């Protein structure tokens, strides 16, 4: 498959124009409801919680400073992507990671009313894990539309891995096993395109399995009007306002073309 390079990111943009063979039309998706977006909106979409041999989120200080500025926040943490282990342990891991940056982490599972917690949140972070479990549990808690509303109104948002995936219009370009069945594939739609976290180009020597490009090519064959950005580990998208999007990451991670 020919990869389409655009001026947003050299990480990998797979353009729908590259797949033009005839096929049956894809089933029409249920579109997200239009929502007003504040010019103060700030969204950080991170590919991963680690970069090379880093500790948990300890490479991302500059990314969080870009998102939060000098202000210190109490951040509502969404741990619902966690499958093996406990929310308590996940919360502690994220608390320890954010402590050097001066932010306080409180997990949504501490609150009796998750909807109220979202309505009153000053900032929101969504952790990685299994995207299918994450989306299913957010729908069960009734917070998908609430988070979308709050972030579009200007509440800062960060999400890594699965938490970055759900910033897209849908979860359809996750790498995860579909262990749960959400009522809809629709997610937050903070950006108008899909991302693929932990993106690695090419296959593994000695293995004959399909590559990440193969999987994304299938997506684009079936969804001709879509675009996908592959985000290598360490890379993030920083979105401000409606759709002003910048690629950020460690100095040796992929940058803009």
For every predicted segment, state its role.
Residues 125-128, 151-170:
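Catalytic nucleophile loop
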């Amino acid at each position: 498959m020919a990869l389409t390079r655009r001026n947003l990111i050299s990480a990998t943009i797979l353009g729908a124009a590259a797949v033009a063979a005839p096929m049956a039309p894809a089933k029409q998706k249920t579109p997200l409801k239009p929502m007003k977006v504040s010019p103060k909106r700030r969204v950080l979409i991170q590919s991963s919680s680690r970069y090379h041999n880093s500790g948990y989120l300890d490479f991302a200080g500059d990314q969080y400073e870009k998102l939060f500025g000098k202000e210190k926040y109490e951040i509502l943490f969404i741990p619902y992507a966690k499958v093996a282990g406990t929310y308590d342990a996940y919360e502690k891991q994220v608390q320890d990671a954010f402590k050097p940056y001066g932010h306080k982490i409180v997990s949504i599972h501490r609150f009796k009313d998750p909807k109220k917690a979202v309505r009153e949140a000053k900032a929101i972070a969504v952790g990685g894990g299994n995207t299918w479990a994450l989306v299913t549990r957010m729908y069960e808690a009734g917070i998908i539309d609430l988070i979308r509303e709050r972030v579009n109104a200007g509440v800062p948002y960060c999400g890594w891995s699965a938490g970055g995936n759900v910033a897209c219009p849908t979860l359809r370009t996750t790498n995860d096993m579909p262990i749960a069945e959400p009522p809809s594939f629709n997610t937050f739609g903070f950006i108008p395109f899909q991302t693929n976290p932990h993106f690695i180009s090419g296959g593994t020597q000695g293995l004959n399995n399909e590559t990440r490009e193969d999987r994304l090519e299938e997506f684009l064959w079936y969804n001709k009007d879509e675009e996908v950005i592959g985000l290598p580990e360490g890379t993030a998208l920083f979105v401000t306002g409606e759709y002003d999007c910048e690629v950020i990451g460690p100095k040796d991670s992929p940058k803009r073309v």
